[in-house]
Amino acid sequence: MTRASRTSWKTLPPPQQREALGFAAAFNDAETELLVLGLVPKEMEDKWFIYFEGPAYRQQASPGPASGQGWLLFHRSWTGACIYGVHLERSPGGARVVDSWVSRDPAQYKGTDVEYDRKLLRFLIDALLLRLPAVFPMPAGVESAPAGVYQHTVVGRAYPESPPDAPFMPAQSRAK
């Protein structure tokens, strides 16, 4: 599988207006490899372009996962707007998130709820990058929309949905 890079898709630079996301996660070696591969859209329904950027994360000559640290960047595929940034750092057995942010540029992203942004980012990682079964987190205020409509604008695919007030349960890691 080919690794996504900044030049794999048309993108805008990361926004100047950002909010700290406080996203916390750790990933095993196999999951880290999937994160580093990223995601290049193949169809119109693919709403995200995701790539890892960090020269210290080059593949090692010996077998095993990459080493170092860098940023996993999440862009909307149609506009190129960069919505999320996740700084990964190598840890024993995988990688962990050491910093994260969400765009607060109102011309590029209308979201303002940091708690929902953490849930959505976790969903994007689980469903799109790790290919785990995942439930799409519905935000407050879209309850009157027909089932699947809001989700389609965000991810373009059909996933089970959770109500806005439901506790968010990330997909189970394959790591033990």
Residue ranges of predicted features:
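Polybasic, proline/glycine-rich intrinsically disordered low-complexity segments
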Residues: 95-176
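Generic structural hydrophobic/aromatic packing signal, biased to beta-strands
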Residues: 1, 50, 86, 100-102, ...
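Short, surface-exposed beta-strand/loop "edge" segments at domain boundaries and coil↔beta transitions
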Residues: 59, 80-85, 106-112
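Generic detector of leucine side chains in alpha-helical contexts
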Residues: 12, 21, 34-39, 72-73, ...
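Canonical SH2 domain fold
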Residues: 70-92, 98-102
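Negatively charged, low-complexity tracts enriched in Asp/Glu with abundant Ser/Thr
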Residues: 1-67, 149-176
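Generic structural motif
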Residues: 4, 55, 77-79, 91-93, ...
